[in-house]
Structures are given as C-alpha cells and as structure tokens.
From Swiss-Prot:
Belongs to the CinA family. NCBIfam families: cinA_nterm, PncC_domain, PRK00549.1. Gene3D superfamilies: 3.30.70.2860, CinA-like, MoaB/Mog-like domain. It comes from Streptococcus pneumoniae (strain ATCC BAA-255 / R6). Disulfide bonds: none annotated. CDD domains: cinA. It comes from the Bacteria. This is Putative competence-damage inducible protein.
Length: 418
C-alpha cells in the first residue's frame, strides 16, 4: 500500500506551526507495514487542494488528509474532498449528538451554522469518532483509493489514529525494526563498506543515520510475527557485522549496542554495575561533562566514587598532586598529563578505573595543538592506556561531547576485555 499524507493549513506553509502530525503518522503507519511515499502541505485553498487530490489519487492507494475539519470558513478539507469525489456531505449521528451535548452544557456559547460542519462526513465514509474534540474524522474507499480525513490538532489526531484508524488499516504483516549503534567509524566509510547490501536491499532493508559522534543503522523487515522478523534481521545483522574496514577491522569492533535510546554511557554504567567495579574521573577540557553524564543514570553511587575538574595547570597540580614542573615540561595537552590525571584520579578515590580528558576544545589552539586535539587516559590494575584523538572541524560543544564519547568507549573496551 502506497500512502500519502496531505497536511492542510496555511499556518504550516507560513511556518507558524510545525507539522508534527506527518512524522507521527509516518511512524505509526510504518509500524503496521504501510509505506508512506509522499508528504505534502497545502494552504487553505480549494483549487490547490483539488489539484493535489488529483495528483494523489493517481499515485497513492491511501491518501490521508490532516487539518481543516473545524468550524471556521477556512476549514474546507471535507467539503473539498466531497467535491473531488462527487459526493455529498452528510451528518454522522454520533458526532451530531456529541455536538448537541457540548452546546447544551454551555448555554452561553453561540451555536452557529459553521459549528455543524464538525459533525459532517463525506457520504459513504466510515466515521472516525473524535475522543477529545468535536470534528469527526472519516475513511472511505473510491475507485481503489482509500481516503482518510483527520483533525489537525495533535491532541485530537493522535487518539483518532491510534484507536480508530490503525485498527482499520492493519493487515497481516507489520514492520519490525532493529537499530545497531556504531562508534569510531564515520557514516561515509560505513556506507561505502555496506554499499552492496544497501544497493541490493529489498526486504529486509537498512538505512544509515549520522548522529553527533556516532552512526546508527536501522534494519527493517515486514513480517507476521516478531519471531519471523528476528530470523530475517539476524541474517542481515550478521552480514553487516561480518564486513570489514579497508584496514581489515571487523565492523563488530565498532558496534557497541542496540536500540534508539541506548548510548555509550548507558552501556558503560550498566556494565560497571554488573561487574561491581568503580570509576573516577579527572577532566580538563570537558569540565565535568563525563561525570555529569554518568550522574544522569540512577543508582550510580555504587559505581561512581567521585572526580576532579582541573581546568588550569595550577589546579591539576594542587588537586591531583602532579608536580607543576612536570606539567610545564610536558604541557597540559599531552600524553603525560592525561596519564597522570587518570592515575591520580584512580589513586585518590581508590577506584577500579580512573579516566582523564585533557585537550583543546577551541576556538583557539593551545600549546601548538590544533582545536580538537584530545588526550584520554584510562588507569586500571593492568596499567594505564592513553589515546590521542583528533576531533577537528567541530564546534566547541561537539569537541567536548565527542571527547566524552571516546572516553566512555575506552572504558567499554576495557570492561569487555576483563
């Protein structure tokens, strides 16, 4: 089924409101296996809406119109659809009764002829009751095309879609998705590696999405059950993870988790809890962002001992007991400083892990290092590891955010190697 969404309302075209209904509808339709091919917005104009309906009827088998069902003169969706289909508007008894009750309880409200429009549906349509408003929706099929009219306010549209429309549209199959999350590899490189899978996809499908510092892959398939979907998605997932970078590194090494809400931080916090280990941090350029991210999760007192924000050389020396002359000799942006910060954070808090971040957030270079240069140290029983990452071409906020992601990834790898 090819679906098309037409949002009716001049206020959308002028930018007065954001068309969140289209996003909601597309998401919910995808969940039941209905593909949305087109989204369009049109003003409150009969001629332009008629033209758009003509186009939609030729290319889509499901046409959903949102908005324009109210009581004002510019609410003309149902009237225009009826004209396009050569049908009359008729009153829905249930909607009429709701309108009667509404005004009976509000004797001071003036009931004008325009109010009656809200109880009308196109002749032959199945009414879609409005649980939170007065304007009734409708669904009808003409010449192989299903037309649906829905109210514009999201508070009215969402329950109508969830409780009225979707049960009437559901077929034997649904869309099932799985999200793979990758860190340490860019979208362009990932897409190049997976070019054959992407170019030849039919079902299941995969779609890459770039986010700040990471990439996700959404795997989707239509199936009649979760078990059937898992079989198809497992095959595609293994095909993806078995691929290698040009340097011969498996994509499995970059895939850190699943799901829309998962993050490197959540993975690390849960694994620290599972292993019963603790962590402390010493931060310079990130100014406590790593620690604040840890503290976003409940129950972290069992794994987070504390930490230090040592922005200046003097505070690195005073708070972490690193000799100032050594810091001056090596520089605050250096492998040495990252190593000592991590080791001292671990030692002073008696934690299993000590993590450190020092570098150049920008906008100016520091000690000859360009913006985006970051040293991250991780101290543990087995010794201290320091990595250098270059996060160039980013804003100050992005440099700090991505640096913290690298720190969490370093801890994640250490936890997995134990």
């Amino acid at each position: 089924m090819k679906a098309e969404i037409i949002a009716v309302g001049t206020e959308i075209l002028t930018g007065q409101i954001v068309n969140t209904n289209a996003q909601f509808l597309s998401e919910k339709l995808a969940e039941i296996g209905v593909d949305v091919y087109f989204q369009t917005a049109v003003g409150d104009n009969e001629v332009r809406l008629l033209s758009l309906l003509e186009i939609a009827s030729q290319r889509s088998s499901l046409v959903i119109l949102t908005g324009g069902l109210g009581a004002t003169e510019d609410d003309l969706t149902k009237q225009t659809l009826a004209k396009f289909l050569g049908k009359a508007l008729v009153f829905d008894p249930q909607a009429q009764e709701k309108l009667d009750i509404f005004f009976a309880l509000r004797p001071d409200y003036a009931r004008t002829p325009n109010n009656e429009r809200q109880a009308q549906i196109v002749e032959g349509a199945i009414p879609l009751p409005n649980e939170t408003g007065l304007a009734v929706g409708g669904k009808l099929e003409v010449d192989g095309v299903t037309y649906v009219v829905l109210p514009g306010p999201p508070s009215e549209l969402k329950p109508m879609v969830l409780n009225q429309l979707l049960p009437k549209l559901m077929t034997g199959s649904k869309l099932y998705s799985r999200v793979l999350r990758f860190f340490g590899i860019g979208e362009s490189q990932l897409v190049t590696i997976l070019a054959d899978l992407i170019d030849n996809q039919i079902d299941p499908t995969l779609a890459p999405y770039a986010k700040t510092g990471e990439v996700t892959l959404r795997l989707s398939t239509k199936a009649s059950s979760q078990e059937e979907a898992n079989q198809a998605l497992d095959i595609l997932e293994n095909q993806i993870l078995d691929c290698q970078t040009f340097e011969g590194i498996s994509l499995r090494d970059f895939c850190y988790g699943y799901g829309e809400e998962t993050s490197l931080a959540s993975i690390v916090v849960e694994e620290l809890k599972r292993q019963g280990k603790t962590i402390a941090a010493a931060e310079s350029l990130t100014a406590g962002l790593f620690q604040a991210t840890v503290a976003n999760f409940s129950g972290v007192s069992s794994i987070f001992e504390g930490g230090f924000v040592t922005y200046s050389l003097e505070e690195k020396s005073r708070m972490l007991d690193i000799p100032a002359k050594n810091l001056e000799e090596h520089g605050v942006v250096s492998e040495f400083t990252a190593q000592k910060m991590a080791e001292q954070a671990r030692s002073k808090t008696q934690s299993d892990f000590g993590i450190s971040l020092t570098g150049v957030a920008g906008p100016d270079s520091l000690e000859g290092h360009p913006v985006g240069t970051v040293f991250i140290g991780l101290a543990q029983d087995q010794g201290t590891e320091v990595i250098k990452v270059n996060i160039g071409g980013r804003s100050r906020a992005d440099v700090r955010h991505i640096a913290v992601m690298h720190a969490f990834n370093l801890v994640r790898k250490a936890l997995l190697s134990d």
